[in-house]
């Protein structure tokens, strides 16, 4: 047991030393998380981090958050095209896949075409950095498990996910593994923290333990739909070193969390 504890202590120390060496901020397991993408907003509520949309966020707001010690995290959709984004015409027809069922105006992207997609994603990450964000939350990095219109393999998805992590790190940004639990074991050494949607609802939170074992932050966004109370999982979350944040799916200012 002592050897095991010593091993994890070394991992935590190594992570802290790496952060100091590269100058990149990383959220810790103790940091509080929040997301606000749509009105009503409340930016006065205490939180350690705040996730905002890359294109919609005002640089003045980000600067104010940072003055108050809040670490801003930048939402970027890297795996699906959105028809309302200002850079939507930069995506060539060759990467446009099937409609993303349930999300109007979105289509899956062919992440096998790193040569075509990575320059666009680098530009988006650069926008995040220039606005003052400290990390990125890349969405839809699990296309290989979905009906995208392309025969994306697990290996090809991993290759894309590693490429965008490198792109973020090159700009001094931390990056979250969002969902994609089947890839967590292979990407925990590359990604800086993990975000999971409804992992307690669907019973896969334990698959993110490769992050927790490295003392990296793991946060579960749980949506209280169908009368479900996600806070009943607080004890289980604590045992897994996972923070629960309960949000409405539209991600306005409303939230609940474990005490």
Where are these regions (language model features)?
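Sec/Tat signal peptide C-region and signal peptidase I cleavage site
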Residues: 16-20
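Positively charged n-region of N-terminal signal peptides that target proteins for export
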Residues: 1-4
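Bacterial N-terminal signal peptides
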Residues: 6-15
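Glycan-processing catalytic domains of CAZymes
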Residues: 21-259
